[in-house]
């Protein structure tokens, strides 16, 4: 089984148990803490991926680092991953868990690029419009891209909405080139 499929299955199992046993908020907070530590520790990631470190040692490492930081149920889960020789999947399980939780809550991510910084009001209007258009809650990541000249581009999943001046100029250029003289 591929690691992506396994990660999704573990994440789904954790999500279902957390919902059923009513500790979803705790697990979500715990996984954010774990993700923060993992993203800041290359050595820990290497240890989790290393075939030279045995299951018991990986479990002890995880217990030592996270034992006092996360809840008992979350600790049981990450030790289970270690004992199943899947500790290397922990970062992707956390990512999949977040994606599944977003799906459940009707949240989608949008990458918004603009030529100039949007005011709070403009950003709020844009997010509300996207929310109405998609029927979902929008988590927008705003960034600047001066190449756009003006306007905005929005990427949601595989869909790109391009309202930039750069794009309009490209369309105009294409239509002028395509017209016979």
Swiss-Prot record:
Belongs to the ATPase delta chain family. It comes from Chlorobaculum parvum (strain DSM 263 / NCIMB 8327). One of its GO terms (molecular function) is proton-transporting ATP synthase activity, rotational mechanism. The keyword Membrane applies. Pfam families: OSCP. This is ATP synthase subunit delta. It is a peripheral membrane protein. Keywords: ATP synthesis, Cell inner membrane, Cell membrane, CF(1), Hydrogen ion transport, Ion transport, Membrane, Transport. The gene is atpH.
